[in-house]
């Protein structure tokens, strides 16, 4: 086992604080509308330019083991805030730095660290309640757009696009962000259920120009197994031909004689038909086929349920207004399923989302829910260069998360104002001793840190700005760093999602409290490497020999 290096008390805290400062100073330059960019070196490809706090935090690794521990703890703050709220990582980092700094001073002055932490925790609970009390719910698309615009660093186009996407797919729809191939950023909304399987054979195409198969008002056969022979389903095919409507077959696979027969019938014009493979794999495939069946009002033809192809009737098939099949995607529009059944299925999926502990499973369940309940929107981010596209994509991701958070929990005035004003809640608290009171005082000072940093990044004096803002009794009155003026921030559209502000404070105080109460640190001692052998220069003592 390698030897360990141990540091105690003030020495440990000082080393840790240096690490906290290095990471926080690199992250906090990005805060606010006039925050700067940070360039991240990559081991391959061009450097990455970003204004995303968590991306900067994740890149920082310090040589000194003790300093690195402090930096990693604050990195954890940024990551946790990002996971829960999706934005506010820089605010959380600034708060954590402020709490740790003030806390370290208090401990050095002889305060009890555990009482300080209790005071900090009590103060944070009071501030969170104050934030909730002053929260305003979002009701209009314009307010949604404002939140997106603020988080995208004042880019109005992005805010508008996110607002449109949320209107179209609803609160449970899925919105994804991708890189576009062109210069422009665009919004693409898929209505209905789309899954990533295309036609099995290009002979099913109905529109050769666009390379798609369009089926209007089709029947949909949902089969769990592979189809190799059509013999068992001939009675069903005859019924479909008599009805004069097209047929879509969704099965594990269609091959051999079955595929050849379908293609020949399609080409001769006797049967309007198309076949696609079932989406997903294993148990997820069964669940997705069940989703399609509920959406279209059909049944999954499965031998597990005792249903054989020979006994299938038209009543067991699903129906939809339109189906479009492309090379790699199939979209079912306006399925004929009963709305109560669809709602019931959505409730079932929501319950599974609540129960699952896997992020991957949660994401897949969320996608299934969106396909049933809302729809899917894709924001394709464009730009002149790859570096620009990546930087914009970071901002769009942040804006999207912030907007979702705002719809979920409401909004408060932005620009760090809500936190600074929430310190009024600390006046009525009662503490068991003076050390706990000092803990609350640490939070009171830290609450001004984001407002001061936003002002500082805009080239103003943070202390003067904070003082001027807190002089006013108007809750919405604050500093607009973009213009350098004081105004009603909510009316001006400068707003923050309550969830983002709340999460940033809770995560920052949690980790900062742990750092303050640290009394010893243990790290691996760097091994002293033995000096390398000198370059070989022949045998010594032979230089003056005669040959």
Curated annotation (Swiss-Prot):
The keyword Endoplasmic reticulum does not apply. GO terms for molecular function: ATP binding; ATP-dependent protein folding chaperone; isomerase activity; unfolded protein binding. It is found in: Cytoplasm. ATP binds at residues 30-33, 51, 87-91, 415, 496. It catalyses: ATP + H2O + a folded polypeptide = ADP + phosphate + an unfolded polypeptide. It comes from the Bacteria. Gene3D superfamilies: GroEL, GroEL-like equatorial domain, TCP-1-like chaperonin intermediate domain. Its EC number is 5.6.1.7. Keywords: ATP-binding, Chaperone, Cytoplasm, Isomerase, Nucleotide-binding. Its main location: cytoplasm. Transmembrane segments: none annotated. Pfam families: Cpn60_TCP1. GO terms for cellular component: cytoplasm. PROSITE patterns: CHAPERONINS_CPN60 (PS00296). Forms a cylinder of 14 subunits composed of two heptameric rings stacked back-to-back. Interacts with the co-chaperonin GroES. Belongs to the chaperonin (HSP60) family. Together with its co-chaperonin GroES, plays an essential role in assisting protein folding. The GroEL-GroES system forms a nano-cage that allows encapsulation of the non-native substrate proteins and provides a physical environment optimized to promote and accelerate protein folding. This is Chaperonin GroEL 1. It comes from Gluconacetobacter diazotrophicus (strain ATCC 49037 / DSM 5601 / CCUG 37298 / CIP 103539 / LMG 7603 / PAl5). The lineage of its organism: Bacteria, Pseudomonadati, Pseudomonadota, Alphaproteobacteria, Acetobacterales. The gene is groEL1.
């Amino acid at each position: 086992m390698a030897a360990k290096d141990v540091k105690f008390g003030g020495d440990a805290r000082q080393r840790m604080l240096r690490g906290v400062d290095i990471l926080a100073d690199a992250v906090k330059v990005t805060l606010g509308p006039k925050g700067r960019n940070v360039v991240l070196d990559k081991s391959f490809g061009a450097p990455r330019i970003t204004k995303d706090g968590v991306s900067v935090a994740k890149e920082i690794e310090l040589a000194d083991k003790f300093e690195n521990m402090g930096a990693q703890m604050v990195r954890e703050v940024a990551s946790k805030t990002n996971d829960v709220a999706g934005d506010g990582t820089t605010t959380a980092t600034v708060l954590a730095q402020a709490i740790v700094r003030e806390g370290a001073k208090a401990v050095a002055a002889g305060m009890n660290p555990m009482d300080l932490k209790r005071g900090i925790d009590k103060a944070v609970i009071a501030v969170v309640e104050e934030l909730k009390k002053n929260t305003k719910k979002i009701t209009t698309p314009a307010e949604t757009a404002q939140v997106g615009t603020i988080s995208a660093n004042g880019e109005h186009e992005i805010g508008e696009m996110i607002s449109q996407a949320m209107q179209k797919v609803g609160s449970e729809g899925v919105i994804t962000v991708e890189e576009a191939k062109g210069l422009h950023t665009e919004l693409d909304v898929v209505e209905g259920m789309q899954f990533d399987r295309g036609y099995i054979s290009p002979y099913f195409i109905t529109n050769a120009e666009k390379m798609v198969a369009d089926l209007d008002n089709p029947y949909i056969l949902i089969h769990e197994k592979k189809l190799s022979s059509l013999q068992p389903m001939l009675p069903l095919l005859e019924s479909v031909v008599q009805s004069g409507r097209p047929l879509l077959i969704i099965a594990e696979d269609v091959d051999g004689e079955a595929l050849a027969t379908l293609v020949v019938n399609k080409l001769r014009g006797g049967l309007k038909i198309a076949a696609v493979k079932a989406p997903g794999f294993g148990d997820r495939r069964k669940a997705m086929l069940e989703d399609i069946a509920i959406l279209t009002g059909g049944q999954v033809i499965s031998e597990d349920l005792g249903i054989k192809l020979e006994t299938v009737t038209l009543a067991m098939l699903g129906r939809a207004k339109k189906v479009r099949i492309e090379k790699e995607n199939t979209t079912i529009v306006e399925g004929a399923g009963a709305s109560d059944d669809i709602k019931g299925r959505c409730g079932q999926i929501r319950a599974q989302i609540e129960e699952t502990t896997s992020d991957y499973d949660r994401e897949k369940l969320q996608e299934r829910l969106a396909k049933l309940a809302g729809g899917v929107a894709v924001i394709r981010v464009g730009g002149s260069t790859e570096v620009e596209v990546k930087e914009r994509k970071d901002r769009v991701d942040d804006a999207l998360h912030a907007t979702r958070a705002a719809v979920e929990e409401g909004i408060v005035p932005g620009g760090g104002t809500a936190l600074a004003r929430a310190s009024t809640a600390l006046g009525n608290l009662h503490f068991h001793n003076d050390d706990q009171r000092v803990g609350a005082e640490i939070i009171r000072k830290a609450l001004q840190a984001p407002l001061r940093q936003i002002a500082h990044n805009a080239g103003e004096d943070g202390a003067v700005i904070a003082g001027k803002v807190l002089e006013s009794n108007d809750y919405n009155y604050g500093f607009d760093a973009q213009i350098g003026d004081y105004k009603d921030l909510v009316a001006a559209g400068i707003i923050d999602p309550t969830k983002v502000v709340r999460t940033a404070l809770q995560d920052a105080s949690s980790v900062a409290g742990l750092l303050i109460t640290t009394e010893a640190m243990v790290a691996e001692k760097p091994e002293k490497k033995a000096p390398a052998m000198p370059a070989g220069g022949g045998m010594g003592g032979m230089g003056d020999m005669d040959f």
